[in-house]
């Protein structure tokens, strides 16, 4: 085993460890800020850790007729997000840098949502089925935006390799293209939907559907789904910073300064998500789809501009 492989393994362990440890922390801070905005005391910041430990400590109840997808969907959902975390820089170079292309990243981040869909479908509850239908409509409208954003970056980098796209974004001194500016606006406006926060959490909608696809889940499997959702917020935030606002978070003269700047920007983005979620009402599914349709039109314009070098 050569040194490159050893460092890749160490980097993967560090990235996964950072996501697993920091995701509940960010969730706890998110809850606390939301409570303060709404003039409530709110739970302690450590509450997400306690909730996960409580769920993981419960008995995993299954019947003999439990479908295989219902048994393994939670594990696959969390695994897909953690694998994506190894492709995305977390303040330092991604441990699997160069091991995958943008198509793999799109696949991994979409797979988490697909696992939730299949898990809800296997449960068969009425509320689950309504949540699934909403989630499916949202994914059909939303995933093209993410794909176009990645492809626009790939066009400017002249490569579909993820490291080329992100490295080109971090170290490029060229002017910010019009297509990049448009996609920055599109992704920023739709970011709440990517991380399934208000006003676009129509598929779960606790007050309407009692968490929709996850209604029939409890114990360790529910903990894994919750963990995947928390981790997704962190991975998407890190990817957004690496692609669209990388300035200052690359290699620095002082070790660790770039890492601190990177996580400061991630924290600002999570704070923005929190403020929007705490101050907006949930959209109806038809309102959300119309909103995404408008963003898709702008994204297609950005794709055309990128094709012509703008």
Stretch-by-stretch model annotation:
Residues 1-310:
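Alpha-helical transmembrane segments of multi-pass membrane proteins predominantly involved
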């Amino acid at each position: 085993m050569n040194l490159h492989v050893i460092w890749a393994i160490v980097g993967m362990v560090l990235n996964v460890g950072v996501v697993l440890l920091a995701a509940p922390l960010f969730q706890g801070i998110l809850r606390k800020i939301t409570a303060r905005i709404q003039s409530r005391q709110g739970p302690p910041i450590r509450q997400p850790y306690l909730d996960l430990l409580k769920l993981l400590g419960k008995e995993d109840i299954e019947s003999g007729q439990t479908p295989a997808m219902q048994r393994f969907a939670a594990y696959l959902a969390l695994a897909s997000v953690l694998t994506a975390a190894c492709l995305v820089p977390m303040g330092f170079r991604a441990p699997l840098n160069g091991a995958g292309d943008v198509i793999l990243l799109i696949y991994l981040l979409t797979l988490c949502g697909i696992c939730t869909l299949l898990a809800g479908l296997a449960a068969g509850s009425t509320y689950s089925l309504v949540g699934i239908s909403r989630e499916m409509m949202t994914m059909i409208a939303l995933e093209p935006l993410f794909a176009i954003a990645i492809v626009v970056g790939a066009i400017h980098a002249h490569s579909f390799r993820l490291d080329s796209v992100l490295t080109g974004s971090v170290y490029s001194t060229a002017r910010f293209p019009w297509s990049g500016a448009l996609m920055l606006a599109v992704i920023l406006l739709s970011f709440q939907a990517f991380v399934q926060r208000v006003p676009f959490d129509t598929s779960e909608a606790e007050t309407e559907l009692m968490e929709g696809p996850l209604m029939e889940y409890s114990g360790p499997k529910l903990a894994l789904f919750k963990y995947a959702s928390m981790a997704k917020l962190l991975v998407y935030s890190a990817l957004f910073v690496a692609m669209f606002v990388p300035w200052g978070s690359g290699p620095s003269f002082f070790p660790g300064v770039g890492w601190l700047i990177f996580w400061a920007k991630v924290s600002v983005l999570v704070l923005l998500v929190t403020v929007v979620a705490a101050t907006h009402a949930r959209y109806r599914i038809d309102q959300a789809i119309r909103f995404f349709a408008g963003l898709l039109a702008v994204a297609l314009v950005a794709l055309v501009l990128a094709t012509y070098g703008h």
